[in-house]
Curated annotation (Swiss-Prot):
CC per GO annotation: cytosol
Name by which UniProt lists this protein: Galactokinase
Keywords from the named record: ATP-binding, Carbohydrate metabolism, Cytoplasm, Galactose metabolism, Kinase, Magnesium, Metal-binding, Nucleotide-binding, Transferase
Annotated Pfam families: GalKase_gal_bdg (PF10509), GHMP_kinases_C (PF08544), GHMP_kinases_N (PF00288)
Binding site for ATP: 69, 125-131
Sample GO molecular function, one term: ATP binding
InterPro entries reported in the protein's UniProt record: Galactokinase, Galactokinase_bac, Galactokinase_CS, GalKase_N, GHMP_kinase_C_dom, GHMP_kinase_C_sf, GHMP_kinase_N_dom, GHMP_knse_ATP-bd_CS
Taxonomic lineage of the native organism: Bacteria, Pseudomonadati, Pseudomonadota, Gammaproteobacteria, Vibrionales
Reaction catalysis annotation: alpha-D-galactose + ATP = alpha-D-galactose 1-phosphate + ADP + H(+)
Function summary: Catalyzes the transfer of the gamma-phosphate of ATP to D-galactose to form alpha-D-galactose-1-phosphate (Gal-1-P).
EC number(s) per entry: 2.7.1.6
UniProt source species: Vibrio vulnificus (strain CMCP6)
Subcellular location: Cytoplasm
A single BP term in Gene Ontology: galactose metabolic process
């Protein structure tokens, strides 16, 4: 993070002509288990990771917000918070920031503008929530600069609202919530219906290894929408608000009445919810053998019932599983059809995992992986007052 801090300080001083007063950060995240459960009102178990978005900031008194994006060649966006805050077609990065500010104002928070320089190292397009980290760090920045009475949960909800309503991208609450509320060496069990969270301690030093298959993700949006509709149809047939409300026993009684495809989709969600709650217990007990079994079952369910994995992802999972055995766990993470796998790996095996993947993955698939070795880290907050 020190390089990011240096970059935002330098760009702030060069472009805006004076020194910032505060450094704030918000992390990306990875979901350990609980896939496609969020929009079914279910459970997820993410952790925040040590890739983050960092801001250098200072308050203004004239209702102007000026933002410098280090990652877009020090491009600048400027707007007046007393005027209508509008969507910028030609500056997509700026819309996340404008949306967060607009939603904060609509929620009744008062502040008088800010100068902000922002940079991040959360890999974009890998499904590690670079957009949520940006939304949360901007909310956190206004909280810090103006001592706003806003909870971390509301910073998360505000970021989600900005993405849904201003940017126009439909997302659940998980990404923002873990970025805002994460804890070092802990995962977070999140109930996507009540938004209650529970910190789940992880074995210290356990590496969270994220491997991007670099398989270009096709069909994601259309397939995602189809899965969502199938889940909603299953919930209707069961007469419940969401699949969260169906037990596996109820499912088994009624499975014959369901269309085969809908049944497979529903079975994934129902069993995945149970697995996620049990995984939190296993992780808390530092029972990595059980955690590994649950992650393996989750992957098989995504592959066979939800049908969202691809050959490259299945290959990566198999390669990693060979190395870690029952000392950790591995599964696809994220929306599917490419993207990443996540593995919980004892530190002593991290180099073996990297070497084995390097030796076998490209030979099997023709693609070169990207590996990120992470730890579970704290959520958003103030880094330093300058």
């Amino acid at each position: 993070m020190s390089e990011l801090i240096q970059n935002v300080k330098t760009s702030f001083e060069q472009v805006l002509g004076y020194a910032p007063s505060h450094i704030i950060q918000a992390p990306g995240r990875v979901n350990l288990i609980g896939e496609h459960t969020d929009y079914n009102d279910g459970f997820v178990l993410p952790c925040a990771i040590n890739y983050q978005t960092v801001v250098a900031a200072a308050k203004r008194e004239d209702n102007i917000v000026r933002v410098v994006s280090v990652d877009y060649g020090n491009a600048v966006d400027e707007f007046d918070i007393t005027q209508a805050i509008t969507f910028q077609q030609d500056k997509m990065w700026a819309n996340y920031i404008r949306g967060v500010v607009k939603c904060l104002l609509a929620r009744g928070y008062s502040f008088t503008g800010a100068d902000i320089s922002v940079s991040g190292n959360v890999p974009q397009g890998a499904g590690l929530s670079s957009s949520a980290a940006l939304e949360v760090v901007i909310g956190q920045t206004f909280k810090v600069l103006f001592n706003l009475e806003i909870s971390q949960a509301e910073i998360a909800l505000n970021g989600q609202q900005a993405e849904n309503e201003f940017v126009g991208c439909n997302c659940g609450i998980m990404d923002q919530m873990i970025s805002a509320e994460g804890r070092e060496n802990h995962a977070m069990l999140l109930d996507c219906r009540s938004l209650e969270t529970e910190s789940v301690s992880m074995p210290e030093e356990m590496a969270v290894v994220i491997i991007n298959s670099n398989k270009k993700r096709g069909l994601v949006d259309s397939e995602y929408n189809t899965r969502r509709q199938q889940c909603e149809e299953a919930a209707r047939i069961f007469g419940v608000k969401a699949l969260r409300d169906v037990t596996i026993e109820q499912f088994n009684e009624k499975v014959a009445e369901l269309d085969e495809m809908v049944a497979k989709r529903a079975r994934h969600v129902i069993t995945e919810n149970d697995r996620t709650v049990e995984a939190a217990q296993a992780l808390r007990a530092h029972d990595m053998k059980r955690m590994g079994e649950l992650m393996a079952e989750s992957h098989a369910s995504m592959r066979d019932d939800f049908e969202i994995t691809v050959k490259e992802i299945d290959t990566l999972v198999e390669i990693v599983k060979e190395v870690i055995g029952d000392q950790g766990g591995v599964r696809m993470t994220g929306g599917g059809f490419g993207g990443c796998i996540v593995a919980l790996v004892p530190p002593a095996l991290v180099d073996d995992v990297k070497a084995t993947v390097a030796a076998k993955y490209q030979a099997a698939t023709g693609l070169k992986e990207s590996i990120y070795v992470c730890q579970a880290k704290d959520g958003a907050g103030l880094v330093e007052v300058l």
